[in-house]
A protein has these predicted regions:
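Beta-strand elements within well-structured catalytic alpha/beta cores of enzymes
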Residues: 8-12, 153-159
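Short glycine-rich phosphate-binding loop at a beta-alpha junction
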Residues: 59-66, 89, 154-158
Length: 197
């Protein structure tokens, strides 16, 4: 069931990093990689294009993950849309999903932990990690706080792939099965992409 919203939301995934290229086939999330994962030149360009699209949206508030690749994204966006960086709210709950002991593993090996059944990831977490449901719960908690604090505002949320995919699913009232179908059909949010809700 879709929630009734008081605000307009713009979900933006950070720009492309080395981990979104064909060269990498590993699971990552947070804690941030060592050395930290930074935007590629292509990622910076994606974000600039997103910023140009956001210019006309009159963004009132920006909420973002505190991970470096998102901070870099926010800095570029803020400059383009004329938003004061001092006003950005960085929130740890908007971080990427925590893959725990699977972080840094090959994607195929990581999915083997779930018997190659993506539906299991909604309920099942790994040691030192979290499930998709847990990730969605923390994203929705931030959304609820925003909804309780503001009305008729244009809100930009800058985060990561899985968290934004899960938040968008909640906002659109999608079932877990619908979310998996979306992922399998490569319809989840791409780097530098804006989804308007």
């Amino acid at each position: 069931m879709k929630p009734i919203l008081k605000n307009q939301y713009f979900l933006l995934r950070h720009g492309k990093t080395i981990h979104q290229t064909e060269k990498k086939n590993i699971i990552y999330g947070y804690p941030d990689n060592n050395p930290p994962c930074v935007l590629l030149k292509e990622g910076i360009e994606e974000v600039r294009l997103a910023g140009e699209k956001l210019k006309e949206k009159n963004i009132d508030y920006v909420f973002a993950s505190d991970i470096l690749r998102v901070k870099q994204t926010v800095e570029i966006i803020a400059e383009i849309i004329g938003y004061d960086l001092e006003k950005v709210v960085y929130d740890k709950r908007l971080r990427d999903i925590n893959w725990g002991i699977l972080g840094g593993k090959n994607k195929e090996d990581a999915w083997a932990y779930y018997d190659n059944d993506k539906m299991k990831k909604f309920e099942m977490s790994v040691p030192k990690g979290e499930s998709w449901n847990q990730c969605q719960e923390r994203m929705v908690a931030v959304l609820n706080e925003i909804e309780n604090s503001y009305q008729n505002k244009n809100i930009l949320i800058v985060s990561h792939g899985d968290p934004l995919w899960l938040l968008e699913g909640y906002l659109k009232g999608k079932s877990n099965r619908e979310l998996i179908d979306e992922m399998n059909n490569n319809q989840d949010i791409k780097t530098g992409e804006i989804r308007e809700i």
